[in-house]
UniProtKB/Swiss-Prot annotation:
GO terms for biological process: cell division; regulation of sporulation. This is Probable cell division protein WhiA. InterPro entries: Homing_endonucl, Sporu_reg_WhiA_N_dom, Sporulation_regulator_WhiA, Sporulation_regulator_WhiA_C, WhiA_LAGLIDADG_dom. Involved in cell division and chromosome segregation. The gene is whiA. Coiled coil: none annotated. Residues 276-309 bind DNA. The keyword Secreted does not apply. The keyword Transmembrane helix does not apply. Belongs to the WhiA family.
Length: 329
């Protein structure tokens, strides 16, 4: 299965409990998949075109559950140059109301050119939800390699720059560029792509991405290839992804209360996902031993798990998909 389709299929099933995140995802999907249209210069309609059935079902269900509006679905079978099936979600009656509720219209009734205010002013969870919606609408992910990239096709420069800002809020570097009069937002760094997949909730896709990425890196080096077999590669990739996902969850649980020295260790784990503990210790300022950096990460996870249990929330391990819980490295 192509990586893009795998990611979109997984994102279409990510459970989201917080209302603000569901609103942000809906708004971003509508903004990047189509948006507002005027019919006969009078009637405002909402239209969104996506390329997977899962994304279409998720958007329709979310709009109904969050805002109480029903939408129409038109399936456009591919033909000629456009061979892929497309799914058009349309709302004619009540379109203006939905546009205002999602922030696609500002207070004066004008279309928003960037991202809606609730997303821009929302927390990190809303920024991740916006990226999830944008990817479901117009995202793609290429195979690991020299030209690897996660890319979102944007409806305009303002929307592209707003999405770059959302990534920055997530500590991920994304860049806006124009190609053939089309605005795009691109993430090219391999670790940053893994981080964004994790933040969007595509945990299984992260495993596939890291597995393919690590395999390619090893094939490029005869010495490294001699030191690893396939089982070790998979185990190493899965353990690195699992550790990073747990650290990411730990930092979310603790928020501003995490001690600085534990936060620094956690950030290093996220910034250098494939690095060994010894390598992490060397890039720490000041340098730490392998045991010292490992101890700080263990204390970070233990503190987060204790806090989560006291708050009745899933721990860093319980928040992982079942298939990842045995890959703790």
């Amino acid at each position: 299965m192509a990586l893009t389709l795998q990611v979109k299929n997984e994102l279409a099933t990510v459970p989201v409990q917080k209302l603000c995140c569901r609103r942000s995802e809906i708004a971003a999907t509508l903004r990047f998949a189509g948006g507002i249209h005027l019919v006969q210069h009078r009637h405002l309609t909402i239209e969104a075109e996506v390329d997977t059935g899962g994304a279409a079902r998720r958007l329709r269900q979310s709009i109904q559950e969050v805002f109480g509006f029903d939408t129409d679905l038109v399936v456009v079978n591919g033909a000629g140059l456009h061979s892929n099936t497309r799914y058009l979600i349309r709302m004619v009656r009540g379109g203006a109301d939905l546009a205002r509720l999602t922030g696609l219209l500002d207070r004066r009734g004008r279309p928003v050119r960037g991202l809606p205010v609730p997303i821009v002013g929302g927390g990190r969870c809303c920024q991740a939800a916006a990226w999830r919606g944008a990817f479901l609408a117009r995202g793609s992910l290429t195979e690991p390699g020299r030209s690897m990239a996660m890319e979102i096709t944007a409806p305009g420069e303002e929307a592209a720059m707003a999405l770059v800002g959302a990534a920055r809020r997530l500590d991920i570097t994304a860049k806006q560029r124009e190609s053939r009069h089309v605005d795009r937002v691109t993430i090219r760094d391999g670790d940053a792509i893994s981080a964004m997949l994790t933040r969007m909730g595509a945990h299984e896709s992260v495993l596939a991405w890291e597995d393919r990425r690590l395999r390619r890196e090893v094939r490029a080096s005869a010495n490294r290839l001699a030191n690893f077999d396939d089982a070790n590669l998979r185990r190493s990739a899965r353990a690195a992804v699992t550790a990073s996902a747990r650290v990411e969850r730990a930092l979310e649980i603790l928020g501003d209360s995490v001690p600085d020295h534990l936060r620094a260790a956690g950030r290093l784990r996220l910034e250098h996902r494939n690095a060994s503990l010894e390598e992490l210790g060397k890039v720490h300022e000041p340098p730490l031993t392998k045991d010292a950096i490992a101890g700080r990460i263990r204390r970070l996870l233990a503190l987060a798990d204790k806090t989560a249990r006291s708050n009745g929330e899933p721990t860093t391990l319980e928040s992982l998909p079942v298939e990842m819980r045995d890959d703790r490295g």
